[in-house]
Amino acid sequence: MGPLIFIDTSVFVAILASEADRAEFEVEIETAARRLTSSIVRLETAMVLASKLDMLPSAAEGQFEKFLMTADVEEIAIDKTIARRAVECFEKFGRGRHAARLNFADCLSYACAKAHDANLLYKGDDFNLTDVNAN
């Protein structure tokens, strides 16, 4: 079994929108010891999929929910500790402050991964400019 992972919005979008790199993310998820995501990722995934696939946000959320259940992904809450880590993340790596240019949801994904000592599974070039452990 692989490591504990926190799954970012970008990965859910890649999988649920059937992007070219979908399979590699599915393998990472399947081989993880434990899989986490957050309620903020739920919202952002529904928003991005609804726009990208021209569907209702509730339908996009339904696809997300089905995937969480199928892949045994645990949804965690954002508490005060995670929120404070997200503020620290923005101060260090946020848009207009650092080359990583992390946005609101990115900062929360970073904070969740750090709070749970999880590797962050993501797509793109932003998180690799931070100090978060990544898959």
Spans of model-derived segments:
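Short, well-structured N-terminal submotif of metal-dependent ribonuclease cores
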Residues: M1-V41, S51-K66
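Acidic, PIN/NYN-like endoribonuclease modules and their adjacent C-terminal/linker elements
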Residues: G2-L4, Y110-N135
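Alpha-helix capping/helix-boundary segments
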Residues: V11-F12, V41-R42, I82, L108-S109, ...
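Anion (oxyanion) recognition and catalysis
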Residues: I29, M69, K114
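General small-molecule cofactor/ligand-binding pocket signal
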Residues: L36, I76, N135
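Helix-loop "lid/cap" segments that line or gate small-molecule binding pockets
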Residues: V48-S51, D72
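Active-site neighborhoods of divalent-metal-dependent phosphate/nucleic-acid chemistry enzymes
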Residues: E74-N119
